[in-house]
Amino acid sequence: MEANKKAKPSYGDVISNLPNDLLCRILSYLSTKEAALTSILSKRWSNLLLSIPILDFDDSVLLKPQKGQRKNVFFKAFVDRLLSQRVETSSHVQRVSLKCRQGGVEPDCVIKWILTTVRDLGVLDLSLCIDFGIFHLPFNVFRSKTLVKLRIGTMIRLSQFPSDVVSPTLNSLVLDLVEFRDGDKVEFRQILLAFPSLQSLRVHESNKWKFWNGSASSRTLKSLVYRSDDDSSAPKPCVSFDTPSLVYLDYSDMVADKYENLKFDSLVEARLDLHLTAFQIMRKPNNIGIVSGDVTTLFKGIRNVKILCLSPDALEALYYRGEKIPMFNNLITLSLGSDKPHGSPFIFWKLLPSLLNNSLKLETLIIKGLVHYVAEGWEGLSPMTPMSRLCFSWDTVSDSLSSSAMKVLEISGYKGTWQELNQMKRFLGNLSRLEVVRVYHKAMDDKERINVMFDLFLLPKVSSECDIQVMKETA
């Protein structure tokens, strides 16, 4: 019995016996407040707090309610003390995240914290989320010689952009709802020139918080995400992308009047979400529109991508403001639709045969959130756009589908209607190399699943290797 007691391990010392480097890594996964609580355990744990490479300050976590009001004194004192200790000990800080969304902290105090992390601590990764009114951020932040990643948002107003600002180390920048003070006219080109090593850029704009004029030029940029929530302003007169090194593009905006100087020499993946304004499209009672302008140039510019994702609105823009669908000679994966319940099924099924016909190497087709059939009477709508006259019919592309390289078909939002079965019949009856069909059904019990599977299994298949999988849609 005594021997058994001696052999029993002491689990209470397991964590304490870990090396400091590993403990610091574990503490980095906690919020800074939670990590600070461990300092009461012993002097060793208190010293570890000064060695954590990641600091996460969030006033929504640290502020405590008292008599119906939030106290900001504790938050301010906590950040002041910890940053001061880190500067005194010259301990390395890799990443700092500062979230001030409750108000009550003076802007000058926040600026002091930011400059301390950049200037004195030499932080590599800085994330700022200041959301208690309009906050003015000085451009001294961009003079850092160590900063590699920077995220700025939301509702932060930047000071005047000086021409001598250069940050040679920054390679990732996020501008989330930012603005330049006093309406300064700052060209996108100036920002890109300030960061000669920039490889990743994310920009989010709204009808108020915006500054991009539609021109982007960079030799180093590899990833660009641009999203505009502005649906009230006029479209940009011209959009150009002089980005020969760009590999990934995620572009969401109103359709511009024109697109030119598009250099996508290295582009592999493109995601387009293009919106038409009321002035760009005038719908008639039969749902056919007459518009001016052309997005054909944009689609020609991305024709060499391997992965293409088009939202329902982008499909509408292509149909109403496009004149020709280019050949996508390298396209392997095509994703159409979105998780949002909108989009015209008429336009979708009008364009799909031509998209498939012009994507000879396509291996994976993903259809998301769109109605998978054309409503009764829509087939007879008279063509009144250049694109509608050029669209292939399913009968026309049947031969090209039979030689298609498509191996995977994935459909979400499937309901199992007879119209959907007719469309599935076209796929299964023509795609000779199809290997997997994944169908996601929203409301499905075991009985519904069996019925859907039974209907699909009865459809004729030209591919003997095709495996049909029916699954419940979780999202």
UniProtKB/Swiss-Prot annotation:
Disulfide bonds: none annotated. Signal peptide: none annotated. PANTHER family: RNI-LIKE SUPERFAMILY PROTEIN. Pfam families: F-box. Gene3D superfamilies: 1.20.1280.50. Residues 12-58 form the F-box domain. The lineage of its organism: Eukaryota, Viridiplantae, Streptophyta, Embryophyta, Tracheophyta. This is F-box protein At3g59150.
